[in-house]
């Protein structure tokens, strides 16, 4: 079967935003207008097509990224293929956003017209910047009380440091919002309410908005001609670009991430969605417009590129593992190059294992269609892959490549969990391991001494939902302990240790001597190992054993057994024995050497500090600040946002549990907050003593 749509007619994009900015509703409208849904699903009814897990429908938030394929006829009458990924906006699910941005070519960033740029918008924005994802902005909820399009434009500049190119102006706002002015065509689009937004009238720009439309069209042209010398020269000579030229320049600037085209509307009231779909075609990249993906040759380790071309060797990236109640385990993958056929096999180059391509599916939210083959640019779901986990590369066994791996954040909160009955024990193990395979920001560990199982994640909601899914999907009843903070330890001083490991007990003995300098790593929180051995005091083949030995004890620090951060180790000398030395002997020696050093190098306890943002009416500002200070918070600043005040602070995670209940009672339910992990910070000594006393008893 040949390719149905040319690769230049593909648009792989995601919809990203703060929680409650209307992502799922916007996606629902897109599916409705592109003909994939016969009725519009509303989030507040629990009927949205993309929110298919039970908890999502109950809580009205999107938890897992649902992928869907749909089609849209552009302004030129040509059909385009859209692969859309709906991403969660709650900060506990940031990992889902990170995964989807990694495999997308473009994104629509949604803003709530009332709130503008919110904390999670900034978090998601930073992730999109990291992967250099071209974006457009849709200022949603223009019908909401307090909606202010122009404030949102300003916030994009001040809070995101980005340049928004305004493509439309709103006609009216709040309950008076009727439609938009198209600044390229210079006409107005007014939607007919009775048609569920399917029909609109193109009319003259209202007289009271003509001057504003002229002003913003001028700004639009000024911004876009800057990226093209010829267009700039013409403009300075009084020659204006025509509409096609403006669109071409907007497309180029968007793909090069020089600026962001900005649109407005209200998805809930069905206004502004179709022009947004036309803009996806006009301005977001096809797989051909983005740079070829880089990878490492599996055999030679040389850097190679894979282009978006069916004739190139197959390469794809697994970006999500999901358990489907009907199909079983599903691996979602983005095909970057080549062609994938049912019945063939691929190699997982990260695990060095072969996987058979059995059932291959194209997904529409939670319904599915079996397909026989897929091509470069496609997003597919593969059934029954046993070895593959998130971030793995799958490719042609004859031309193996390892694509760039994804980076995942460390969990900041952990909870002790115990099955209620012996029969639940095995099921719980299976459930936790499956969750860990699906979600790399979730970790499971068992304390060797106490036998207690802990699981760690990105926040209370993240862990609540995991327990809930375990109960629903695996029928496991478990007792859950109070949340615990994922503390870390580090060293603050330089220490040099000389350690000899010697064991003689008949037969082959063990011998290894290491001299190592331990100090804080000036480059950050990672572990850094360096060898300055000259003259073969420690043979080259034993040096990896030294590194491995130190790494094996970094998981349990000297103060309270927490993992260690920010350590640098430099091997400067050592000795070996021709017969008795081995990699294992050097591993044992370096392990003991580090344990000695950790006691003397000024070990320090670190705690996760959260960036907290509270949005509150002015009446409660004093109470909110006083409360944050009492939680060991450091106020970073405050600013006005409409009729509310936004307070920013860094607060230890340990002092933020159940904060939402306090904030509600303090503000009579009128204040809201959000928090994201910011950095690790030393724990004050009086608090550190309490923590050590509490955890040393458990370890």
UniProtKB/Swiss-Prot annotation:
One of its GO terms (cellular component) is cytoplasm. Residues 8-288 form the tr-type G domain. The keyword Protein biosynthesis applies. PROSITE patterns: G_TR_1, G_TR_2. Its main location: cytoplasm. Keywords: Cytoplasm, Elongation factor, GTP-binding, Nucleotide-binding, Protein biosynthesis. It holds the Pfam family EFG_C. One of its GO terms (molecular function) is translation elongation factor activity. Coiled coil: none annotated. GO terms for biological process: ribosome disassembly. The keyword Nucleotide-binding applies. GTP binds at residues 17-24, 86-90, 140-143. It comes from the Bacteria. InterPro entries: EF-G-like_DII, EFG_II, EFG_III, EFG_III/V, EFG_IV, EFG_V, EFG_V-like, G_TR_CS. It is found in: Cytoplasm. Catalyzes the GTP-dependent ribosomal translocation step during translation elongation. During this step, the ribosome changes from the pre-translocational (PRE) to the post-translocational (POST) state as the newly formed A-site-bound peptidyl-tRNA and P-site-bound deacylated tRNA move to the P and E sites, respectively. Catalyzes the coordinated movement of the two tRNA molecules, the mRNA and conformational changes in the ribosome. PANTHER family: RIBOSOME-RELEASING FACTOR 2, MITOCHONDRIAL (PTHR43261:SF1), TRANSLATION ELONGATION FACTOR G-RELATED (PTHR43261). HAMAP family: EF_G_EF_2_B. Belongs to the TRAFAC class translation factor GTPase superfamily. Classic translation factor GTPase family. EF-G/EF-2 subfamily. This is Elongation factor G. The lineage of its organism: Bacteria, Pseudomonadati, Pseudomonadota, Alphaproteobacteria, Hyphomicrobiales.
């Amino acid at each position: 079967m040949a390719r149905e749509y040319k690769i230049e007619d593909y648009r792989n994009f995601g919809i990203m935003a703060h929680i409650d900015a209307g992502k799922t509703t916007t996606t629902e409208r897109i599916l409705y207008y592109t003909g994939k849904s016969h009725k519009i699903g509303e989030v507040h009814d629990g009927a949205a097509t993309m929110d298919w897990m039970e908890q999502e429908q109950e809580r009205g938030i999107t938890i897992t990224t649902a992928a869907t394929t749909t089609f849209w006829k552009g302004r030129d009458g040509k059909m385009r293929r859209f692969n859309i990924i709906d991403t969660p906006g709650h900060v506990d699910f940031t990992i889902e956003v990170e995964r989807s941005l990694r495999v997308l070519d473009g994104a629509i960033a949604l803003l709530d017209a009332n709130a503008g740029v919110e904390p999670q918008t900034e978090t998601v924005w930073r992730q999109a910047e990291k992967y250099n994802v071209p974006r457009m902005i849709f200022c949603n909820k223009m019908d909401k009380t307090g909606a202010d399009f122009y404030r949102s434009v300003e916030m994009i500049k001040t809070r995101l440091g980005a340049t928004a190119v305004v493509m439309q102006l709103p006609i009216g706002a709040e309950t008076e919002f009727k439609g938009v002015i198209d600044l390229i065509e210079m006409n107005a689009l007014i939607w007919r309410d009775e048609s569920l937004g399917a029909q609109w009238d193109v009319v003259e720009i209202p007289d009271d908005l003509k001057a504003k439309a002229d002003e913003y069209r001028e700004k639009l042209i000024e911004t876009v001609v800057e990226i093209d010398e010829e267009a700039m020269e013409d403009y300075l000579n009084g020659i204006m670009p025509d509409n096609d030229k403006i669109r071409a320049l907007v497309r180029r600037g968007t793909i090069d991430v020089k600026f962001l085209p900005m649109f407005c509307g209200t998805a809930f009231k069905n206004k502004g969605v179709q022009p947004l779909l036309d803009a996806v075609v006009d301005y977001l990249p096809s797989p051909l417009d983005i740079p070829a993906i880089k990878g490492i040759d599996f055999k030679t380790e040389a850097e190679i590129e894979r282009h978006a071309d069916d004739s190139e060797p197959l390469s794809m990236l697994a970006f999500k593992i999901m358990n489907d109640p009907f199909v079983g385990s599903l691996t979602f993958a983005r095909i970057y190059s080549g062609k994938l056929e049912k019945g063939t096999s691929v190699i997982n180059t990260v695990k060095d294992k072969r996987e058979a391509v059995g059932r291959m599916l194209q997904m529409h939210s939670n319904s599915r269609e079996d397909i026989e083959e897929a091509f470069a640019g496609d997003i597919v779901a593969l059934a029954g892959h046993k070895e593959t986990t998130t971030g793995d590369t799958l490719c042609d066994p004859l031309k193996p490549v390892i694509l760039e791996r994804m980076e995942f954040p460390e969990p900041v909160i952990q909870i002790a969990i115990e099955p209620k009955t012996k029969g639940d024990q095995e099921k719980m193990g299976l459930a936790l391991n499956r969750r860990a395979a699906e979600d790399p920001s979730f970790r499971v560990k068992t304390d060797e001494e106490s036998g207690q199982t802990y699981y760690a994640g990105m926040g209370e909601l993240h862990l609540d939902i995991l327990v809930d899914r375990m109960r629903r999907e695996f029928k496991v009843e478990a007792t859950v302990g109070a949340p615990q903070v994922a503390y870390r330890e580090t060293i603050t001083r330089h220490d040099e240790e000389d350690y000899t490991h010697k064991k003689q007990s008949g037969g082959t003995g063990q011998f290894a001597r290491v001299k190592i300098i331990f100090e804080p790593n000036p480059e950050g929180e990672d572990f850094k190992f360096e060898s300055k051995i000259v003259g073969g005091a420690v043979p080259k083949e034993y040096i990896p054993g030294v590194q491995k030995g130190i790494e094996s004890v970094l998981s349990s620090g000297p103060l309270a057994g927490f993992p260690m951060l920010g350590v640098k180790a430099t091997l400067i000398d050592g000795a070996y024995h021709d017969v008795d030395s081995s990699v294992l002997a050097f591993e044992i020696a370096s392990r003991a050497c580090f344990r000695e050093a950790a006691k003397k190098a000024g070990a320090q306890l670190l705690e996760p500090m959260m960036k907290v943002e509270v949005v509150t009416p002015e009446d409660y500002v004093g109470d909110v600040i006083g409360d944050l200070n009492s939680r060991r918070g450091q106020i970073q600043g405050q600013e006005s946002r409409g009729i509310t005040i936004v307070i920013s602070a860094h607060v230890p995670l340990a002092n933020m549990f159940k904060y939402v209940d306090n904030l509600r009672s303090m503000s009579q339910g009128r204040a809201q907050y959000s928090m994201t992990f910011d950095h690790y910070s030393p724990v004050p000594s009086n608090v550190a003593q309490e923590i050590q006393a509490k955890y040393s008893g458990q370890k």
